[in-house]
A protein has these predicted regions:
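Acidic beta-strand-to-loop metal/phosphate-binding motif
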Residues: 50, 128-137
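Residues immediately flanking
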Residues: 51-53, 96, 137, 164
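Acidic, metal-coordinating catalytic cores used for nucleic-acid/nucleotide bond scission
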Residues: 109-110, 133-145, 164-169
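C-terminal anion-handling pockets and recognition modules
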Residues: 173-209
Length: 209
């Protein structure tokens, strides 16, 4: 038996078209040298971000010290036993015009946390500008609590939703994959707060490059 993923989104093609149109419009904002072309004075500035959550990042501690490479082993050796310290959720967006990665690390990823991220974006960009997000259809993205917040900032945000089973259309997925390979895989910490700080440090280093 082989498995496949049934397309259960009747609007899959239209939603995919909408996402790809955002990317096409974005590509036209860069010249042949890859330099961003500023908006004209009579245009509304639109900031385009790819957004997603990465929940369940485990804070894991070792129960004994790692053994450094020596005569008997050529790699770092680690005890099989470990201690779980809890999990955190990463809410993040990538500004597709500047390349800046914007993180928020929380204990959960509910409507309150999502709204906190939106407020972070609202504080970051000039008030006259529009913020366009490419994101999935997670319930918190359109919850009653989220809608109430959005009603307080009319016209500020625009959402372009990926189709169900279309996460591959969201560019931040590639960033999360890189984050896992480079930093989260095999990470050990002494406290959950240390994990949070190391995630933020990773983003700082990415944004410095």
């Amino acid at each position: 038996i082989t498995y496949y993923c049934e397309n259960r989104d009747p609007d899959f093609d239209q939603k995919m078209h909408n996402v790809l149109l955002v990317y096409k419009q974005l590509s036209l904002q860069f010249d042949e040298n890859g330099q961003f072309i500023p908006f004209s004075e009579d245009e509304q500035v639109v900031h385009v971000l790819s957004y997603d959550e990465k929940p369940g990042i485990q804070a894991i501690a070792t129960t004994s010290e790692d053994l450094q490479p020596g005569n008997n082993h050529k790699t770092i050796s680690r005890d099989y036993e470990y201690k779980r310290l809890g999990t955190v959720s990463l809410l993040a967006g990538i500004d597709l015009q500047t390349g800046e990665a914007i993180p928020l690390v929380k204990d959960s990823h509910n409507s309150k946390d999502y709204i906190e991220f939106l407020k972070k974006l609202d504080d970051k960009y000039p008030k006259a500008d529009k913020i366009r997000l490419v994101l999935d259809n997670l319930k918190v993205h359109s919850s009653e609590q989220t809608r109430k917040y959005l009603a307080t900032v009319p016209g500020r945000f625009e959402f372009v939703f990926t189709p169900k089973h279309g996460s591959w259309l969201n560019l931040i997925e590639g960033f999360f994959s890189k984050l896992t390979r480079q930093m989260l895989k095999g990470i050990r910490v002494k406290t959950k707060d240390e994990l949070v700080q190391r995630i933020y440090k990773y983003f700082d280093e990415v944004n410095e490059d």
